[in-house]
């Protein structure tokens, strides 16, 4: 893909308006628009290093991908204190960012969602409506390979503090992830409700089911010196499924207590 600076600027404007996005849900299935990732990578190649310093704070980055500027008309709340949104990221009206937080290029954050302090929404991550990303949670970026599915958090999900969701993991609607839950494509997630491990789907990614309530857990090593020493390895555990009657944070608090 070959672009000039004006074409790339127009492309970023389309991303920022929500007219185009890296992944979209079609007939219940998520589809990657690989050409958008290709264009983002082209933008990095186009750019030259430039001084973006502000006052006493030194910043140097590619001139094609500066910090995105917002106006009151965008209806996005970015509370003062060190947050940053990169060019080419979409934040819908009514999104709230608490400082400091960061949203990278290609990310899509839908209406009513909150990004709390010290949280990251990585490149191309797709965040649904009314999602709560709690303090220090990390939603990983997936820019390469271009055909790889980004991390996707569907509507109404609660991501607890210090969670880490990486490598194209899909979290379905209404799920609740307790503080400290870490999931990537090779993480063994145990479903204690159904008595089995969640297996990667046909694309190789882990899918957390809709309404699942997930907490950090462990499982024992079964053989070798680790077993003899009583060592356990980290394993997220689905402890129940939400029934839709209880607020996510209250339900999680009750389970943990």
What spans do the regions from the language model cover?
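Terminal amphipathic alpha-helical/low-complexity segments used for targeting or macromolecular assembly
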Residues: 1-76, 205-206, 210-212, 216-257
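Structural signal for interior beta-strand "rungs" in well-ordered beta-sheet cores
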Residues: 72, 77-222, 226, 238
